[in-house]
Amino acid sequence: MMNSKLEQDLQTCLSMIRADWKMQNNYLDRQTNFIYRCDSLEKCLEQIRIAGVEKEYALHRWYNYMTSVACEYLFCEFGAVHDNDVYNHDVDIYINGIPFDVKLTIYPAKLSHRPYDLKTRTGKNEMIKWYYANQSQQSRKQMLNRLYVVCDGKDAYECLIMKSDFKLLREKISSFMRYSLNNGINEIDIVDNGITYHLKSDIIYISYN
């Protein structure tokens, strides 16, 4: 799935979008759901033309979706195995046979005061607990093993840049995989509705600092 053409497409797409896109809404999402069937920028632009939808909204969704997919396959370059079912929303990859959901995300705006130092184990574990506590109710009920690739830029546009900075992503993910294949994945207890879940979860911190 991961190839140089896709990397080039994502870089080109990045130059066509701004960071301050409008808030997602169900109506525009339904209009632009074709993005999930477009494996290239060319196909996405063609579908935008055919559907007559807002170009930047569709491109922004395609960029976020395809960078997330690309991120999953970066793990596979360094020893993970991708799930055979591309429609499986619960499992993206396996590391040493253990299933994981991969989330490419940004440092949450709600935590703009930076309460957690993601360069430390304690900070990462506190952030992981925050992520699980602030998921949608549907996701919380599943309580899956998760790997969070967290982009921490100086602003929203730098976070967008980081999502397709494959040199930096490969560097951080390869380092994580080398350690994890030899030492296992961080384990953490998450309490939800009085029930304790013992999960494997970690954060791969992406920053230019």
Task: Enumerate the predicted regions with their spans.
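Nucleic-acid endonuclease domains
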Residues: 1-89, 104-209
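Conserved catalytic cores of phosphodiester-cleaving nucleases, focusing on short active-site segments
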Residues: 93, 98-106
